[in-house]
From Swiss-Prot:
Name under which the protein is recorded: Mdm2-binding protein
Assigned keywords, A-Z: Cell cycle, Growth arrest, Phosphoprotein, Ubl conjugation pathway
GO cellular component assignments: chromatin; kinetochore
One Gene Ontology biological process: protein localization to kinetochore
Parts of the chain that traverse the membrane: none
Modified residues (Phosphoserine): S597, S639, S703, S707
Region entry Interaction with MDM2, spans: 521-904
Chain residue ranges for the region called Disordered: 19-38, 754-784, 800-830
Native source organism of the sequence: Homo sapiens
Family membership noted in the UniProt record: Belongs to the MTBP family.
Ribonucleoprotein recorded as keyword: no
Source organism phylogeny: Eukaryota, Metazoa, Chordata, Craniata, Vertebrata
Biased composition (Basic and acidic residues): 812-830
Amino acid sequence: MDRYLLLVIWGEGKFPSAASREAEHGPEVSSGEGTENQPDFTAANVYHLLKRSISASINPEDSTFPACSVGGIPGSKKWFFAVQAIYGFYQFCSSDWQEIHFDTEKDKIEDVLQTNIEECLGAVECFEEEDSNSRESLSLADLYEEAAENLHQLSDKLPAPGRAMVDIILLLSDKDPPKLKDYLPTVGALKHLREWYSAKITIAGNHCEINCQKIAEYLSANVVSLEDLRNVIDSKELWRGKIQIWERKFGFEISFPEFCLKGVTLKNFSTSNLNTDFLAKKIIPSKDKNILPKVFHYYGPALEFVQMIKLSDLPSCYMSDIEFELGLTNSTKQNSVLLLEQISSLCSKVGALFVLPCTISNILIPPPNQLSSRKWKEYIAKKPKTISVPDVEVKGECSSYYLLLQGNGNRRCKATLIHSANQINGSFALNLIHGKMKTKTEEAKLSFPFDLLSLPHFSGEQIVQREKQLANVQVLALEECLKRRKLAKQPETVSVAELKSLLVLTRKHFLDYFDAVIPKMILRKMDKIKTFNILNDFSPVEPNSSSLMETNPLEWPERHVLQNLETFEKTKQKMRTGSLPHSSEQLLGHKEGPRDSITLLDAKELLKYFTSDGLPIGDLQPLPIQKGEKTFVLTPELSPGKLQVLPFEKASVCHYHGIEYCLDDRKALERDGGFSELQSRLIRYETQTTCTRESFPVPTVLSPLPSPVVSSDPGSVPDGEVLQNELRTEVSRLKRRSKDLNCLYPRKRLVKSESSESLLSQTTGNSNHYHHHVTSRKPQTERSLPVTCPLVPIPSCETPKLATKTSSGQKSMHESKTSRQIKESRSQKHTRILKEVVTETLKKHSITETHECFTACSQRLFEISKFYLKDLKTSRGLFEEMKKTANNNAVQVIDWVLEKTSKK
C-alpha cells in the first residue's frame, strides 16, 4: 500500500526541542530563526526530519505482500506528502499530494515549502505594520474553515480504499492554543480522514495531554512529545485495519480495530512441527519479474477469521517463508490488546488462520464518489449516532491472502503467509521434485560407489538370447583362428591360455557391439520401485526419477492438493449460501442452512475409483449421485455399448445415465433438426398479421368438410355442423372485435405494409361479393398470427383501397375492377394462384371447365384449401402447400359434389 503523509501545523510552530536540532543538519529554510520578531516556521524542518527517518528505516529485505494473481505483480511502494499550516491570520495548504523521492537530496516538495514560508513571513510583516483594528476584522473561524475546505480537497484526491495508508501529524503551538469553536471545521475534516480513510492521527507537542485532550479523544489520536516526532511514522507497516470474527449461528460479528501488519526481515524458516512428508529445500524464486505487467492491489479493510488449525495437519507445501508481524496502531483499545495477547500465546503447534481479501486491477481505480467530502458533509448533516463507512465496490480480480497467526516467543505475534489452494498447481509440485533431486545429487554420488541405475537393464529372455549369440560368435572366432593358423602353416593345436584369451577378447568386443546396437533400456515402473527399495537398504539416496520420490500414493502432493481444493470449494459454497460472507466455522455450533443445490463429490470418494496410476479401477460407469430424496438406481450389468444395441422396447424400461434423452422411436433427432432449420428461416418482421376492422365472411357450407390433411391421412372428416358452429363463433368474435376497433381507433387512411398477408377474406362494404385474399407471390410469405390476437395497432398488409365501400352501380364496379387490374395486391395474387391451383388439380381428375360440376367442385375445393391455409404458421413454401392441400382433398370434394348432383 502507498503511504500518504499529511503535516498539519497550527499556531506559531516553534519546536526547538526536536525540529530545530534536526534542522541543523539540513538546509536553512527560515531566514528568521533566532530572532524574536520572526517565527521559527518549521514545516520544511519537519519534512526533512521525517524524510531522513523514513529513509533510514526502509529495509529492502523486509517482507512485503507478494503477487497473488498470475495477471501481474504489484508495483513498488510510493510515498506522498502534503502540508497544511496556519500561523496567525495566514494559512497555506498543498494543492495536491507530492511524491517523496528518497534518492534525491532536494525535491519539489522542498521548493514548495520554501516558497510558502517566504510568503508566510511576508504576510506576518504586513500584519505587524497594520493597526490592531484591521487585524481584529479578520475572523479565525473563517481561516480554519478555509483550511478545512483545503483538507477536504486533499481527501478527495486520495485513491480508492485499500490502496493507501494515511498518516496525519498535527503540530500544535505551546502558547495560546486555538479555541474549540474556531478550529471545529478543521477537526471535522480530519475526522473525515480518520473514519472513512482509516487515517492514523498523531498529535505532537509539549503539554499536549492537557491542551489537546478533547481533540485527541474525538480523533482517536496518539499524543507524543516533540522528541518522539522522528518515530511517529513506521515505514514497516504494510496494512492497517481490523480483525473480524463472525459467528454464523447467531449472525453476530465481533470486530477488533487498530491492527496492522508489518514487514519483517527474512529469517530461517522452522518447520519442525509441520507435516514434512514432501518438504524440500526452499526454492529461490526467479528475480526476473519484468516479464509480468504491473498491477494494483486493493486490500480489504479487515482480517477475517477462518478457523483454528493444527500445524501437523497442514502440508508443508502450503507454508511460505514470508512472515509479517501483527501489531497495534493504538494501544488504547483494550479489546484489541487482549486479542493480541491471546493470539501471541498460541504455541508453535497450533495457529489461527485468517484471510485478507484483495482485489487486483490492471488500471488505477479513480477515487470513489461515496467517500467524497460532499457525501461526508451530507452524512454529518443527518447527525448519525455512530459513523459508518459507506460500501465501496472495487472492481477487479478477487483474490486473498491466507495468514497463519502465532506467537513468536517474544510476546509478539507473527503472521506466516499460507499458499491458497488456487496457488498450488503443477508448477509447484514440479519445482518441489526438482529441488529435492538437486539437493540430493552430491550425496548420492558420495554415498554410493557406483550407479546401478546407469547399468543396462535386460529381461531374462534377452540375456539368454545374448548368451546364445555370444556362443555362436565365439565358435566363429575359434574357427577363423584355426583357419588362419592352418594357412600360416602353424600347428592347429591351441593352448589353454591362447584359447582363454581368444574367448575373453571375443566376448569383450561382442558386448561392446551389443551395447552400442541396443540402447540402455528405461526402467519400468515396478522395476524402478524394486530397485529403489534395494537402494534404500544401503543408503538413503533418492533416485533420479520424479516418479520414485513418493512410493506411497497417499503421500503424493497432488492428493493433498486435491483434497484441500475440494474442501476449499465446499467452504466457498457455504460462504456463498450463508448470509455472512468470508466467515469462519461456527464458534458455538453448526448452523443448519439451506441445502446446496450443487452436489459436491468428496475427494476421498473420488479417489476410490482410480488406481495409483491415475487409471480407473474398472469400466467407466456413471457415479450414482443422489441429488434428492429419491435415489436413481441404475440397471445392473448395463454399459453404454450394451445400451446402444438394445431395441427401443427394452431400452425404455432400463435405468441408465442419460437414457431419458435418447429414447427415440420416431427419429426425434432428425425431426428436431428439421424443425430447428425451419424455425431459423422465420423472419421476425414477417411473422406479424393484421388486425382488420372488417368482419370475417362465412363461406356457404352445407356439407361435411374434409379436414386439412397435410401431415395426416385424408380419411378423418369432422362433422359439418361442428365446423359450421366453429365458423359462426369465429365470425361473431371478429364482429365484436371490429366494433371495438372502430371505437378505440378512429378511421384513418391505412398504408400498405411490407409485412405478411392474411388469408382471411375481405368484404367490400355493401357488396355480397367476396374478394378472397391469399398470401404470397413466392414461398417467402410470412407467418400470419391467429385472428384472436390482442387489440394492438399492427400495420395492415391488406390494401384497403380495394376494400372500400362502393355503390351498387356499374360505374363504381367498373372503377374497382380497373383499379384491381392496374395494381394487384398480394392477397389478391394469392387468391388467384390458389384458384389456378384448384383448376389444375380438378383437371388432373378429369373435371375441366366444361364439366357441369366444375363450378361447384372449384368453389368447394377452394374454400377447403383456403380454410386450411389460413392456419399456417409460416408462408414459406406456400405454393407447395396449396398444391398439396388441393390434391389431398380433391377426391373427397369431387365424390361429394357428384353424389349430391346425382341425388337431384
